[in-house]
C-alpha cells in the first residue's frame, strides 16, 4: 500500500507545483497566524486553480474557533480540516468536510484515545517546530492505528522512517524548506 504524502505550509505557486510533481496526495494550507507558513484564506483561491482534482486540500488550524473556520469556508472548501483533536467538539463542520485530528506525543498520551472515523496525525509537542516524535513510540502507535506522522521529517530521514515505522502517511513541512515558510 502506498504511503499517503501530505506537504504542509504551501504559500506559493512554485511550492504547490513542486509538491504535486513530487507525489503529494494532500496539500496543507496553514491558517495559524503565528506560523511562518500562514496564508490568508483569500490567497488560497488563486492557488487552488493549479490543484488537480485527485489532490486533496487541508485547512490546517490550531485551537480553531467557529469564526476562524467560517472565514476559511467562505474562501474555499477544503477536503479536510486539521486541528487539535479536542477542538472539533466546539466546531460545526459541514458533513462533506473530513477531519484530521491532531494528537501530540505527551507523557499521558493514550493511543486508544484516537478514534477510527477520521484521519489522525501524531506529532511532537509543538506544531511546526520540526521536533520528531520518539521513533519507538511511533512504531508501536503505527502498528495499532492508521496514523499520519509529522515532525522532523526530511528527505534525509524519510526513507528510514518509512521502513522502520511504517506509517499510513507522512506530513512534511519544515523538512523541505530552504528558509522558514519557503519550500525548496
Segments the model singles out, each with a brief description of its role:
Residues 1-184:
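Conserved N-terminal beta1-alpha1 strand-loop-helix module at the mouth
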Amino acid at each position: 500500500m502506498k504511503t499517503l504524502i501530505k506537504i504542509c505550509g504551501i504559500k506559493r505557486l512554485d511550492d504547490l507545483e513542486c509538491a504535486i510533481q513530487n507525489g503529494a496526495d494532500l496539500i496543507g494550507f496553514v491558517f495559524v497566524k503565528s506560523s511562518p507558513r500562514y496564508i490568508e484564506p483569500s490567497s488560497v483561491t488563486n492557488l487552488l486553480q493549479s490543484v488537480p482534482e485527485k489532490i486533496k486540500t487541508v485547512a490546517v488550524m490550531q485551537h480553531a474557533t467557529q469564526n476562524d473556520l467560517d472565514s476559511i469556508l467562505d474562501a474555499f472548501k477544503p477536503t479536510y480540516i486539521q486541528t487539535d483533536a479536542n477542538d472539533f467538539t466546539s466546531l460545526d463542520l459541514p458533513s462533506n468536510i473530513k477531519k484530521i485530528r491532531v494528537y501530540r506525543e505527551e507523557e499521558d498520551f493514550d493511543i486508544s484515545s484516537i478514534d477510527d472515523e477520521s484521519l489522525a496525525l501524531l506529532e511532537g509537542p509543538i506544531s511546526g517546530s520540526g521536533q520528531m516524535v520518539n521513533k519507538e513510540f511511533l512504531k508501536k502507535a503505527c502498528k495499532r492505528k492508521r496514523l499520519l506522522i509529522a515532525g522532523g521529517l526530511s528527505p534525509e530521514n524519510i526513507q528510514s522512517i518509512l521502513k522502520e515505522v511504517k506509517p499510513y502517511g507522512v506530513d512534511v513541512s519544515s523538512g523541505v524548506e530552504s528558509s522558514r515558510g519557503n519550500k525548496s
